[in-house]
């Protein structure tokens, strides 16, 4: 188990960095007007991967072994590396020239040169200030402790236990201190204020900008609700109908289809008409309606209902997420010397909020489900389930399946419905923030004008 945890941590670090860099590289390769299409294409890739991954993983788990869920990453990751090296030319150099330069650098390296040429004080300053080591450590530790508190609360420990309270309080305090450090202390300790590469993890000039805060809150809230829906849509079919992991994952196909359609449509509309906020609001409205419809999904729902209610969440995220990233990038002042760095920072912050919402959505959904399920089982006085943890109850249910309309089937259905109600709340808040987002849009040049990247306030 320890090896599994360490492996997942390493994979998560790489995966989160890949997503951010894909958007940064993709968006910088084209002009601003073509950027919506690039964002749409990348979003489609991530949306398909996010759904196809669980389906393939479920098939491996059901028919082979769960270890293949990890083995399959080796050829896929290797192919991705080869494609990247052969196609991306950061310095307009071919892959062979880059390899020759790297070999030349390594062959000419000696420890004596390193010892005399490298100033270790400057090296430490680079680690601390270029990578914002302290801000990153405080932020990461705070978020991890807070999420652990939500995970353990009501499951391994009671909510009023010292362990859970300590996790939650320390997590919040560390996260707040990371903001204080980045916003107010970083510049005071910075030994090279004029060095543009010495920047905090969260730059106050950008992060504290109301338009950027609002649009990233949209991303955070919608991703929180969406991931809760995705996780417990699969759990709905596994726990209530005893579907295998593979068959339960197949029910997510409607979301893939609608998400891809909406993402492509969003990119085309933004490129042709320059619209951003209308797409945000449209996506927010679809999200609220879709989340409301998902609360109608119970153990007595028909097959058509189970498929139909999963369509709108895909449409919602397809329209809203692309527009939110585009809106965040439009807030950059392009005539500043740091505009290129600001662009990377804003894109990375938007991706961070997306990842944070996805993570928190999974944890909060599990917390709501576990608390609801445990309380309902306790009130029902079901003898086989008394005195068991939620995980043990679920295991017993799967080993002693008694149908979807049994007492425990009804309890599971009601508990999952509570998760969907929570998701509806996040979508409603997301729609509220959509309404207050920036009105900036892309300017579409007239036919007799030279296309230029520009902004316009409406």
Curated annotation (Swiss-Prot):
Residue intervals on the Vacuolar side: 31-36, 89-132, 185-205, 270-277, 328-415
Protein name per UniProt: Vacuolar basic amino acid transporter 3
Species this protein is from: Saccharomyces cerevisiae (strain ATCC 204508 / S288c)
Record has Transmembrane helix as a keyword: yes
TM helices/strands, residue ranges: 10-30, 37-57, 68-88, 133-153, 164-184, 206-226, 249-269, 278-298, 307-327, 416-436
Cytoplasmic side: 1-9, 58-67, 154-163, 227-248, 299-306, 437-458
Gene Ontology annotations of biological process type: basic amino acid transport; transmembrane transport
Glycan attachment sites: 195
A Gene Ontology cellular-component term: plasma membrane
Membrane protein topology class: Multi-pass membrane protein
Main subcellular location of this protein, as a coarse class: membrane
Job of this protein: Transporter required for vacuolar uptake of histidine and lysine.
Family annotation (InterPro entries): MFS (IPR011701), MFS_dom (IPR020846), MFS_trans_sf (IPR036259)
Keywords: Amino-acid transport, Glycoprotein, Membrane, Transmembrane, Transmembrane helix, Transport, Vacuole
């Amino acid at each position: 188990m320890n090896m599994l945890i360490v492996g997942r941590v390493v994979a998560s670090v790489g995966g989160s960095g890949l997503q951010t860099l894909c958007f940064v590289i993709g968006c910088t390769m084209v002009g601003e007007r073509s950027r919506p299409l690039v964002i749409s294409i990348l979003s489609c890739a991530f949306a398909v991967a996010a759904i196809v991954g669980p389906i393939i993983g479920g098939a491996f788990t059901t028919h082979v072994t769960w270890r293949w869920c990890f083995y399959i990453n080796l050829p896929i990751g290797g192919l991705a590396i080869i494609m990247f090296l052969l196609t991306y030319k950061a310095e307009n150099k071919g892959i062979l020239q880059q390899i020759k330069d790297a070999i030349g650098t390594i062959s000419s390296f000696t420890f004596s040169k390193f010892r005399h040429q490298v100033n270790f004080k400057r090296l430490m300053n680079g680690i601390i200030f270029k990578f914002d080591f302290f801000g990153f450590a405080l932020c990461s530790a705070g978020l991890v402790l807070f999420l652990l508190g939500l995970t353990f609360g009501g499951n391994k420990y009671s909510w009023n236990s010292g362990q859970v309270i300590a996790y939650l309080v320390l997590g919040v305090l560390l996260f707040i201190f990371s903001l204080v450090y980045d916003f107010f202390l970083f510049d005071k300790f910075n030994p090279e204020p004029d060095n543009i590469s010495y920047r905090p993890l969260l730059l106050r000039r950008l992060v504290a900008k109301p338009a950027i805060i609002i649009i990233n809150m949209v991303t955070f809230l919608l991703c929180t609700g969406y991931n809760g829906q995705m996780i417990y849509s699969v759990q709905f079919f596994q726990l209530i109908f005893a579907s295998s992991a593979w068959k339960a994952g197949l029910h997510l196909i409607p979301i893939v289809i609608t998400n891809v359609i909406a993402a492509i449509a969003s990119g085309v509309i933004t490129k042709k008409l320059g619209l951003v906020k209308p797409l945000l609001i449209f996506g927010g409205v679809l999200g609220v309606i879709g989340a409301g419809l998902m609360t109608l999904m119970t153990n007595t729902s028909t097959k058509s209902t189970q498929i139909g209610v999963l369509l709108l969440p895909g449409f919602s995220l397809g329209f809203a997420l692309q527009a939110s990233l585009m809106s965040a990038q439009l807030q950059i002042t392009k005539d500043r010397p740091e505009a290129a760095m600001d662009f990377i920072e804003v894109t990375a912050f938007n991706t961070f909020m997306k990842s944070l919402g996805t993570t928190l959505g999974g944890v909060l959904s599990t917390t709501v489900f576990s608390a609801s399920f445990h309380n309902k089982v306790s009130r029902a006085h079901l003898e086989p389930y008394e005195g068991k943890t939620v995980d043990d109850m679920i295991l017993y249910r799967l080993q002693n399946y008694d149908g979807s309309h049994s007492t425990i089937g009804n309890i599971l259905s009601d508990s999952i419905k509570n998760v969907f109600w929570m998701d509806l709340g996040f979508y409603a808040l997301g729609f509220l923030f959509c309404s207050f987002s920036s009105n900036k849009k892309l300017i579409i040049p007239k036919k007799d004008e030279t296309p230029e990247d520009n902004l316009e306030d409406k």
